Amino acid sequence: MKIFNTWAIALMAALCAQAQAQTKFSAEDFAKRPEAWEVALSPSGNYAALAVPTADGMETQLQIVELATGNTQVLRFARQQHVIDVVWTADDQVVVSRAKMEPLKARPSTIGELMSSDIKGSNQDVLFGYIPDVGNKRGRRKDEGWSTITKVLNGEPGMALVDFTCWNCGDEPDTVIFKVNTRTGDRQEIERGDKLATYSFDQTGEPRLRTTWDDQDEPVLHYRQKKGAAWTPLPKSIAGYKLYGARFAADNNTVYALVVDDKEPAQAYKIDLEAGTRSKLAGRSDVAVSNFMYEGMDGVPFAVTYDADKPSLQYTNPASEWAKLHAGLMKSFPGQMLSFSSFSRDGNKVMFVVWSDRDIGSYYVYDRTTKQAQKVSDYKPWLKPAEMAQVKPIEFTNRNGEKLFGFYTAKGTGPKPLVVMPHGGPFGVHDTWSFDSDAQFLASRGYAVLQVNFRGSSGRGDAFLRSGWQGWGTKLQEDIADGVRYAIDNKLADPNKICAYGASFGGYSALIQPILYPDLYKCAVGYVGVYDLPLMRKTDALDGASKRTKRFFDRTLGTDDKALAAVSPVQRVADLKVPVMLVHGRDDKTADFNQYKAMEAALRSAGRPAETLVVPGEGHGFVKPENIAEFYRKLEAFLDKNIGPNAK
């Protein structure tokens, strides 16, 4: 680890930005796992905890690094297990979530079990999870559910609040809040709520705000004026239609939260619960506030961020010392974004992460007394930012006159062979101005990449999200095609060299686009896609999904199988005239493997067999780096002969 002052940070950033001899990075370079998934600063400010994948990628270890010396203690919780979501509950105690690698995710995902350890690894325990019986020994834990730390009680070292939801307790299981001693595993139930309740806590750890869901899947908001008081409806005059991201100030009455009044983009508010009033801190009419930035561990906000177009921030309190610190650090990293991620208890040390469209990110610790910064970890240092492609935010108007955002990734200028890459979901997610491994790999091979945040994407408010419902094969596809025409009209794309590629819903879009807009495309690549929408509805109905999940799919996809068949690539295969590549995990349970089989058979019957890649043991997207790298190489070869240098 290296220590340097703020002017040295600026010099280092400038040197890193200088162009160097261009390197052709391998598929393995983009597929390789990072040096650390995440980093968290201890409350004392003396240690950093790093979730570090092993060289073979089969597990994640927790490394405890003493910042002053670099001395490292490696904690292993279980062989071939991953851990994530590192939380310090005391100066010498950490809690992690047991995790597994999830397809299409940039990092491991929790499986709902919590484990604790002291920093020497000598006292480890399962706090929440299922420990099976072994021989005559009965497992101590039999928690069949999902657990998450929701608050660390900073005034009580080692104590935390855990949210627990049962796995097998019906469609709407109770949410139980436990106060847990993370050193001993002792727990005490302090709150129980139905209707999938979620809670916000004041700084004493008292549940004060609660969100549940009615039978129409709309949010219901309640609050508790003080400990022991009854839950009462939160007035819409302060809570609006929806309130989330709430945090209590030190007075345990003032709340900072994101509020949606009538399905518009979320705005940032300061709320006085006792007075029943609120004041707006920040917000835009076209883009939702995505997050607050806070003054230290338990402080008030000094800024908000937006990320639906190019990420930006707005200082809500420019006079704050924290705002000044943030602005000063930002000057040391021009063209990048910087977020505070964790703090020491006294606020003297701050961990921050720096990232951009060309840089996945690096973690630093800044000492406010010495004004020195210490780099703790890079995410993928072998991918040199100066040799990555720029991600350019774009804005255009669709055929209905609606403003849409998107991103264009390419090296250099001028019309290029274009890969159109719709995001998955399709609802409630959106592409961002950030490092995307798929896009950067393709850009390194000479292609431009277009990503469109079509109607139904998140980050623009509930009205924009809902405007895409029941538009899988219509409205959403119109927006993608309008984005392609924008790229052509603005000399960003070679109109004779365009291919569609995507995963999940993006895989569906990749195949339906050349059916609906045959004049635009020369090829299509479907990766773990859905190609028969009526079959998807039938499969999901038999799959044990909850009533709430089924209602959501009916509401967002539609229930008219005839109409859905009309926009399904399997049923429209006669209109699919371009070369196709199909890629799927044999164990995919999200876009069921039957989807791949139906599409492959339809293309074969039509006399236009697809190029294929099927990998046993993989699911909804590939997890193993070697399989991701193999896919990248096959994707490169397919594009090369259809829109690349060897295209006819």
Tell me the role of every PLM-derived stretch.
Residues 382-496, 503-504, 538-543:
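Cap/lid segment of the alpha/beta-hydrolase catalytic domain
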Residues 41, 50, 88, 396, ...:
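Conserved hydrophobic/aromatic "anchor" residues
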